[in-house]
């Protein structure tokens, strides 16, 4: 009987201190700034700069993403909305592209005939590593992605472990 009482109390303590709410977004003090012109991803917290990593993109043209398939990296402020270990690119942190602001820019460019009428906005933009054993692509500034941001695999592992879902990411030229 004492054992049942002990297990009951232990269970109550466990469940009272357990949250079954899975947070979708973190109130992270970290934020990331990606500078396309410097090929650099920098991590900051409330106290300031923490670390920077070399990066590459999709296209040598550093302009803002216009439409799906242009291989350009979008500019603006985004949020990390998901993280996963990736079989091709080591780690992947998905961004919330396109945002409402991106959709507005896209529609305006379509109306102004800057982009083709049949163009789509695209999506699936994220931060990830390189193909296995191809970190040299970052060292040689080989822009190879479809618009994502690519780091060396050792660097993307560090970033993946440090950044929670909900981290703000600013991409600028």
Language-model segments: which ranges?
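Exported/periplasmic cell-wall-interacting domains
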Residues: 84-173
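Well-ordered beta-strand positions in beta-sheet-rich domains
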Residues: 31, 52-54, 77, 124, ...
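Short, solvent-exposed loop/turn elements at domain surfaces
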Residues: 41-44, 51-52, 62-65, 88-91, ...
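Histidine- and/or cysteine-centered catalytic micro-motif in compact active-site loops
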Residues: 37, 46, 55-58, 83-85, ...
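Sec-dependent signal peptide hydrophobic core
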Residues: 5-9
């Amino acid at each position: 009987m004492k054992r049942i009482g002990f297990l009951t109390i232990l269970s109550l303590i466990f469940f009272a201190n357990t949250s079954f709410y899975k947070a979708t977004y973190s109130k992270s003090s970290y934020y990331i700034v990606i500078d396309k012109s410097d090929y650099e991803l920098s991590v900051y917290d409330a106290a300031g700069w923490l670390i920077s990593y070399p990066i590459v993109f999709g296209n040598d043209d550093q302009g803002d993403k216009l439409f799906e398939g242009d291989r350009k990296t979008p500019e603006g402020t985004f949020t990390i909305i998901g993280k996963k270990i990736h079989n091709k690119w080591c780690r992947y942190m998905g961004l919330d592209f396109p945002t409402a602001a991106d959709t507005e820019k896209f529609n305006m460019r379509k109306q102004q005939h800057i982009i083709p009428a049949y163009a789509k906005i695209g999506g699936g933009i994220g931060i990830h590593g390189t193909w296995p054993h191809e970190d040299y692509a970052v060292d040689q500034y080989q822009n190879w992605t479809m618009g994502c941001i690519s780091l060396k695999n050792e660097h993307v592992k560090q970033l993946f472990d440090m950044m929670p879902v909900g981290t703000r990411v600013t991409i600028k030229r």
